[in-house]
């Protein structure tokens, strides 16, 4: 009972109960903090041959600055670790580009706020010969089709006191609500 939701939480609604989905995502993590926090290790203990591993990073990775950082440097290296580990388990890695933030230009077009990260993900998918789900482009089309005002219904935009303990208005243009997720 909270305003935030992710596609990893909602994806279960699109499968029968014969499919088991384990969502290891945690808000605020980057590819390297996911690995550094041993979440990949934990995930791998549950992974079986024939499983699918959907890998989406980029939102928080782009905040990392400094030597060796960037979409085509450390980020690509960490994403490749996910791919390699999944393959060692006999699983199928699938890359997912990050969803768009709700930031429009003056012409009502969604801005690109993820720098080179979506392109790096697409390039890795080609190089590794694995599928990519392009949520970057899908959410761009969705938000531009809905428009500036209507797209607020996808994100965490709520007046104060909509949720228990929420005393201030929420205007989050990065994170989805259950409808948007």
Regions found by a protein language model. Give the residues of each.
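Alpha-helical cap/lid subdomain in secreted, periplasmic
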Residues: 38-179
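Short, structural beta-strand-to-alpha-helix junction motif
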Residues: 29-30, 177
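Serine-esterase "nucleophile elbow" of acetyl-processing enzymes
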Residues: 1-25, 41-49
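Short glycine-rich, polar/acidic loop-and-turn segments at beta strand-coil junctions
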Residues: 25-28, 59
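Structural motif
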Residues: 30-38
């Amino acid at each position: 009972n909270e305003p935030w939701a992710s596609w990893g939480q909602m994806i279960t609604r699109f499968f029968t109960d014969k499919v088991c989905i384990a969502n290891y995502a945690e808000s605020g993590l980057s590819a390297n903090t996911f690995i550094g926090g041993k979440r990949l290790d934990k995930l791998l203990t549950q992974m079986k041959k024939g499983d699918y591993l959907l890998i989406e990073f980029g939102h928080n990775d782009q905040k990392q600055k400094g030597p060796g950082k960037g979409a085509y440097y450390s980020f690509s290296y960490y994403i490749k670790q996910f791919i390699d580990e999944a393959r060692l388990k006999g699983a199928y890695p699938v890359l997912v580009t990050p969803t768009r933030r709700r930031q429009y230009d003056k012409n009502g077009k969604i801005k690109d706020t993820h720098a080179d990260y979506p392109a790096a993900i697409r390039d890795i998918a080609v190089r590794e010969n694995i599928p990519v789900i392009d949520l970057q482009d899908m959410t761009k089309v969705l938000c531009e089709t809905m428009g500036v005002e209507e797209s607020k219904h996808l994100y965490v935009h709520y007046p104060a006191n909509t949720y228990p303990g929420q005393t201030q208005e929420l205007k989050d243009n990065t994170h989805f609500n259950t409808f948007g997720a």
